[in-house]
Amino acid sequence: MSKPLDHVKRPMNAFMVWSRAQRRKMAQENPKMHNSEISKRLGAEWKLLTEAEKRPFIDEAKRLRAMHMKDHPDYKYRPRRKPKTLLKKDKFAFPMPYSLTGDHDGLKAVSLHGAGVLTDALLCHPEKAAAAAAAAAARVFFQPSAAAAAAAAAAASGSSTNPYSLFDLSSKMAEMTHSSSSIPYTSSIGYPQSSGGAFAGVTGGGHTHSHPSPGNPGYMIPCNCTGWPSPGLQPPLAYILFPGMGKPQLEPYPAAAYAAAL
C-alpha cells in the first residue's frame, strides 16, 4: 500500500535518533546483513546503554517532537490496522470422541447437551447417568425390542449400591444375548436358526451363544446356530470329487456295525 503524497511522518523517538547513525555504520560494515538483523542488534545495544548515555538522544527527541507539533498541530497518529483473517477457534475442538453419523438417535441426544450438563449429571446423579448411557448404547447396537429390555434392566438396577455396574460388559452380556435371541440378522450372516437346523430336535432349540465380532474382537455377536449332535448319531458324510478322481475305495466304518461288533 503506497502512502499518500501529503503523508506526515511520525516524529522520531530517542532510539530512532540514536540508531539513525548507528544503522548506517553497521550497514557499511556488514553489507550482506539483513535490515531486520540490524534492527535486532541495535535494539540489544540500546538496552545496554546507561541513562547518562541516552540523555542526549532523549533531549533531541523531545525537541523534534515540539517542532513536529508546531508544524502539524492537527496531526494524530493513526497506525494501520491489519485485517483480522484468523478464524475464532471453537471452545471445544472435539466435543465427542467419534462422529455421530447415521441413525444413532441415542448418541445424538447425548451430544446435544453440553459438556457441563453431562458433568453435572455424572456428579449429582451418577446412577441416572449410567442408566441413560446403557440405554443409549443398547439403542445403537440392538433392535428396539432389545433396547427396551436393556433400558428396563438399567432402570431396575439403577438403585443398586454401585451406580457404575451397568458398564460391566461381562455381567450384562448374558442379559443382552437373551433379550436379542429373536434378532433376525443371525440368519443373514450365515448361521442357521435353531428351529430349522438338521439337529434341532436333538439340541432342543435352546442353544444360544455368542461369537466375537470380526471388526471388533471385544464385542460379542449373539448367535442361534445349532450345537454339535449327540454322540449316538452319525453325522452325514460328504465327498469332495476332483476331475479324474472317483469315490474312495475304503468306506468309513459305520458306527452301527462297530456297535454290533462290540
Curated annotation (Swiss-Prot):
Q: In which tissues is it expressed?
A: Expressed throughout the developing central nervous system, including the olfactory placodes, with strongest expression at the boundary between the midbrain and hindbrain.
GO annotation, biological process: brain development; negative regulation of DNA-templated transcription; negative regulation of transcription by RNA polymerase II; nervous system development; neuron differentiation; positive regulation of transcription by RNA polymerase II
- Can you quote a single GO CC term? nucleus
Keyword Transcription regulation found: yes
User: Which CDD domains would you find in this protein's record?
Assistant: HMG-box_SoxB
Where would you find this protein in the cell? Nucleus
One annotated GO molecular function: DNA-binding transcription activator activity, RNA polymerase II-specific
Could you tell me the superkingdom of the organism this chain comes from? Answer: Eukaryota
Please list the residue ranges the record marks as binding DNA: 8-76
What keywords is this UniProt entry annotated with?
Developmental protein, DNA-binding, Nucleus, Repressor, Transcription, Transcription regulation
Q: What does this protein do?
A: Acts as a negative regulator of transcription. May function as a switch in neuronal development.
Q: Which PANTHER family match?
A: SOX TRANSCRIPTION FACTOR, TRANSCRIPTION FACTOR SOX-21
Name of the protein in question? Transcription factor Sox-21
- Organism this protein belongs to: Xenopus laevis
